[in-house]
């Protein structure tokens, strides 16, 4: 076992750099725990506010004897022109703060360099979020291998790789509505330019930041991916080949949350009493509930949220609807009460205003569908729980994930969203799916057609394969072993 080797011959020390956004930090904390369970000393470097988000989960891990420590560095907000209190990506109130935020984050290079000079034992490896290109300079200065973590699936990473190698494909498109086929792909898949992450050119300082991110990607030693071989074998194999063998699929990392409290508080403490939520679910028939959650950075316009609510109501099916970023949705709260919506659906609709215990909900036998924004964490959690998906992508890698879920894996139904919802421009787009469209999509997912039954069967099988992948002897468990052996050989050859 690698854990025995690391203790006896060479103590490995990994330093983890999560990006300051909820969807990026959650899996990175899981990765920290997975590696610590193998005897690797883990140091997580983050800012005070972000450290506080994971205090409970990490305290339990440390109390159980896992060798994890957190080092806090102050974000130089003022120096970067960022107003105080904007320590997380999901707390930014406007697009104008995006560049100052990234500037502040990458100004951490100097304090982190000082940390590395004093660290003991000397770090053997850096695992960095791809949004933190400054960690490449740290890795180079201290001659330490840097492993990248994107938080995306192999399907999406391979798509980005192919398009960067064949830039003329995007350059030759006549408009943002024109579709193109991704070449050299195991399946025929079409996209428009805005649907592909990092594909559109943005002028000025943001372009420079993106170029730094791409360059740091190219020069990293390898990549770890939160997926499992059995989920997307052709894409995992092709992406590994594209990375010269240095790509390790180690997921689903969420499965390290075996304790109920860890599942309930993964990412944030829930804004609903866990027992109240489970009691409500217990009262519903098996497979009857649709769980609706559009992520931590969803800011659909009020007009669209109303149509979603009315469609859920007209579907006549029980549902849980999570509205995060609640303070930004005061108008929706008013509509819930003023229109009578909350009163009308109270017997079969549970509204969670804030953070939900998502893993506990998805694992419950009464849940039979998941309406998701297709962020990779949520997508993978749904599949891992054996729940078919109703896809409603917004931006980033989410359209890639939808294509994988609906067209390749055939475990989901599209709500019909084709247009990218650019952050800060939601009102311009307006309603993309009306209440009839919502009702129809819910019926297609939750109904009793042959296709619906086949989707349920397929996703349950993929869920079982996920559980096997992380067990000893499984593909992801073995890949962690392989990664640690690789880094250990490097560490020994450097000393």
Curated annotation (Swiss-Prot):
Natural source organism: Barbarea vulgaris (Yellow rocket)
List of catalytic residues: 24, 129
Example of a GO MF term: UDP-glucosyltransferase activity
Full protein name: UDP-glycosyltransferase 1
Gene: UGT1
Documented EC number(s): 2.4.1.368
Pfam family for this entry, one: UDPGT
GO-annotated biological processes: saponin metabolic process
Family classification: Belongs to the UDP-glycosyltransferase family.
């Amino acid at each position: 076992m690698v854990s025995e080797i690391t203790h006896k011959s060479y103590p490995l020390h990994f330093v983890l750099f999560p990006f300051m956004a909820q969807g990026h930090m959650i899996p990175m904390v899981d990765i920290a725990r997975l590696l610590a369970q193998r005897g690797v000393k883990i140091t997580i470097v983050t800012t005070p506010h972000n450290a506080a988000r994971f205090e409970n989960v990490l305290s339990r891990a440390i109390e159980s004897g896992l060798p994890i420590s957190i080092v806090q560095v102050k974000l130089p907000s003022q120096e970067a022109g960022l107003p105080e209190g904007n320590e997380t990506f999901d707390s930014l109130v406007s697009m104008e703060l995006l560049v100052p935020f990234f500037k502040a984050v990458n100004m951490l290079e100097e304090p982190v360099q000082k940390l590395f000079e004093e660290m003991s034992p000397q770090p053997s490896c850096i695992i960095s979020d791809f949004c933190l290109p400054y960690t490449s300079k740290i890795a180079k200065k201290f001659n330490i291998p840097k492993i990248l973590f994107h938080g995306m699936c192999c399907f999406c990473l391979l798509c980005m790789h192919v398009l960067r190698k064949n830039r003329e494909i995007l350059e030759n498109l006549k408009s943002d509505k024109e579709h193109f086929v991704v070449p050299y792909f195991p399946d025929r898949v079409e996209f428009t330019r805005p649907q592909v992450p990092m594909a559109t050119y943005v002028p000025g300082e943001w372009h420079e930041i993106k170029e730094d991110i791409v360059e740091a990607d190219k020069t990293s030693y390898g990549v770890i991916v939160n997926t499992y071989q059995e989920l997307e074998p052709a894409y995992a194999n092709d992406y590994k080949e594209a990375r010269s063998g240095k790509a390790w699929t180690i997921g689903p990392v969420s499965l390290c949350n075996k304790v109920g409290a860890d599942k309930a508080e993964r990412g944030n403490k829930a804004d609903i009493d866990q027992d109240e939520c489970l009691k409500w679910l217990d009262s519903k028939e098996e497979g009857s509930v649709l769980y609706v959650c559009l992520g931590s950075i969803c800011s659909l316009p009020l007009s669209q949220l109303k149509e979603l609510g009315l469609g859920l109501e007209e579907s006549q099916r029980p549902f849980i609807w999570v509205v995060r970023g609640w303070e930004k949705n005061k108008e929706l709260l008013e509509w819930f009460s003023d229109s009578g919506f909350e009163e009308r659906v109270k017997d079969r609709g549970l509204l969670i205003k804030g953070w939900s215990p998502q893993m506990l909900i998805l694992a419950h036998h009464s849940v039979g569908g998941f309406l998701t924004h297709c962020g990779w964490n949520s997508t993978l959690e749904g599949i891992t729980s054996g729940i078919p998906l109703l896809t409603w992508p917004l931006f980033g890698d989410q359209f890639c994930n939808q294509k994988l879920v609906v067209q390749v894996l055939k475990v989901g139904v599209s709500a019909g969203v084709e247009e990218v919802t650019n952050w800060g421009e939601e009102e311009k787009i307006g309603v993309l799916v009306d209440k009839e469209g919502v009702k129809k999509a819910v019926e297609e997912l939750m109904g009793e057609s042959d296709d619906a039954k086949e989707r349920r069967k397929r996703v349950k099988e993929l869920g079982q394969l996920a559980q096997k992948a992380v067990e000893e002897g499984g593909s992801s468990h073995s890949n962690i072993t392989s990664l640690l052996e690789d880094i250990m050989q490097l560490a020994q050859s450097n000393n």
